[in-house]
Amino acid sequence: MQFIDRSEIEVEGGRGGDGMVAYRREKYVPAGGPAGGDGGHGGAVVLEATANLQTLLDFKYRHRFEADDGTKGGPKNLTGAKGKDLVIAVPCGTVVQDAVTGETIGDLTEPGQRLVVAVGGRGGHGNTHFASNQNRAPDYATEGRLGQQRKLLLELKLLAEVGIIGLPNAGKSTLISVLSAARPRIADYPFTTLVPNLGVVRKVTGDGVVFADIPGLIEGAHQGVGLGHEFLRHIERTRVLVQLIALDSADPLADYRTVIDELGRYGRELLHKSRIVALNKADVCLPEEAEHWRRILSTETGEPVLVISAAARSNLDALLARVWQVLEAPQGVTT
């Protein structure tokens, strides 16, 4: 299941340093020739993939990036210092495109992989460069060139293994936000309301598992009502579905059947996907009422049904344990 997070940025390589006009002044060289050094080249802008980032959220607050300029050439034919490259960390899975031409520049998939996206300008020539038999003491040098400027579109494709589905009132986003708040090593990134909320959960082994809530699943979704078609397609690519049902609903059983009906109408194969059913919002109803609906839903599904409260952080460990159990089972085997 892939979601795309996009950010547009501007990058500019550093300007090259100017060349210098200078002459030899040693007393043993009475007719000193030119000795102006070249300017240093400007630094480049480089993207580097890292496993420590999961989203492009950093680029929401900063859009322009410039590498350092090269320094001016010096006397005695000294070349100016090269500008320092600007290395920008991006998540693995970032596809880089030229925002103007649409050309794909690169795809950063492995940690440590680098891509130069804007080269620095060349340093200018000092007057030594222009000496000739006709002009033994040129009194001019050239300026450094500007660095490359580009507008880039960054697209991040994340693979979500766990899809959280349910009607709009089921508490899907709350569940992800609570899981993230409870575990500092989980990165939570809120997309707009038109795309899923993602939360990266790290197991005790250190492996990251991407959870995504799937908005837009309402009655008529299979016909494209709301955002139905788009998100039902996303659901096809998950390994396991967590179906949340709100206990404060007038009829939790009807809510369950509505979602199942939409899944089946879109594609019968979705009904065979590993699915965990959880009654949410146990904090807003009596325990006996929650147990009543748990029994009904267990009979309906033929599977154990969990009772949780995302808001109260109740029984979430049991939910995650069940998710890990399903994910660790061989693919194609329902646990």
Curated annotation (Swiss-Prot):
Q: What enzyme category does the UniProt record give? A: hydrolase
Residue ranges of domain OBG-type G in the record: 160-328
Keywords associated with the record: Cytoplasm, GTP-binding, Hydrolase, Magnesium, Metal-binding, Nucleotide-binding
Entry protein name: GTPase Obg
Report domain Obg positions.
1-159
Q: Which species?
A: Gloeobacter violaceus (strain ATCC 29082 / PCC 7421)
> NCBIfam families in the record, alphabetically?
Obg_CgtA, PRK12297.1, PRK12299.1
Locations listed in the record: Cytoplasm
Primary localization class, coarse:
cytoplasm
- The record lists Mg(2+) as bound by 173, 193
Give the record's GO CC terms: cytoplasm
Q: Which residues form a coiled coil?
A: none
UniProt lists the family membership as follows: Belongs to the TRAFAC class OBG-HflX-like GTPase superfamily. OBG GTPase family.
According to its UniProt entry, the protein's GO biological process terms are: ribosome biogenesis
